[in-house]
Amino acid sequence: MNIRQQLVQLLNLAMVLSTAFMFWKGLGLVTNSNSPIVVVLSGSMEPAFQRGDILFLWNRDKYVDIGDVVVYEVKGKPIPIVHRVLREHKVTNKDRKVRQLLLTKGDNNPTDDLSLYAHKSNYLDRDEDVLGTVKAYLPKVGYVTILITENKYAKLGLLGLMALSTLLTRE
């Protein structure tokens, strides 16, 4: 394989990666969420959602309702949490802006999420903490992501296969 063919393959790989990145960012713009697709990592929402389910989020609604399943991030913790809204109330700021505050709980958990929230915080702020509301899901499809994340040999094997296929594919 000459240098020109190698450059073409490298450009094809760059095109695939940039297309995936543009798709992700475009989906984020449409859904108004930094993380429009997430994978369930625990059993806290069983039986509604199982470990490995892929969730599709929507974050364009001004408020969420009691009973909605939301994905939120806690300040200082990297992994988003998927739980159901248990309680909500609205607070008007000094500048007359209405903020929605939420209390959540996993369906399979005995207590609410108060202990998970940021230090000295009794509620989630809808605008600051919530990534989106779950609108659809695909069962079990996210297990591939979990396998790659939790198993370093699976990650190395997948990267090796990708590199090998790139080197062996001819145009």
Curated annotation (Swiss-Prot):
Coiled-coil annotated spans: none
Residue ranges annotated as Cytoplasmic topological domain: 1-6
Active-site residues, record numbering mapped to chain: 44 (charge relay system), 83 (charge relay system), 113 (charge relay system)
Function: Catalytic component of the signal peptidase complex (SPC) which catalyzes the cleavage of N-terminal signal sequences from nascent proteins as they are translocated into the lumen of the endoplasmic reticulum. Specifically cleaves N-terminal signal peptides that contain a hydrophobic alpha-helix (h-region) shorter than 18-20 amino acids.
Descriptive protein name: Signal peptidase complex catalytic subunit SEC11
Complexes and interactors: Component of the signal peptidase complex (SPC) composed of a catalytic subunit SEC11 and three accessory subunits SPC1, SPC2 and SPC3. The complex induces a local thinning of the ER membrane which is used to measure the length of the signal peptide (SP) h-region of protein substrates. This ensures the selectivity of the complex towards h-regions shorter than 18-20 amino acids. SPC associates with the translocon complex.
Lumenal compartment residues: 25-171
Domain notes: The C-terminal short (CTS) helix is essential for catalytic activity. It may be accommodated as a transmembrane helix in the thinned membrane environment of the complex, similarly to the signal peptide in the complex substrates.
Top-rank lineage group of the source organism: Eukaryota
Region (C-terminal short (CTS) helix): 157-168
Compartmental location: Endoplasmic reticulum membrane
Organism: Komagataella phaffii (strain GS115 / ATCC 20864) (Yeast)
GO molecular function terms noted in the UniProt entry: serine-type endopeptidase activity
Gene from which the chain derives: SEC11
Transmembrane intervals: 7-24
Main location: endoplasmic reticulum
EC number: 3.4.21.89
Reactions listed under catalytic activity: Cleavage of hydrophobic, N-terminal signal or leader sequences from secreted and periplasmic proteins
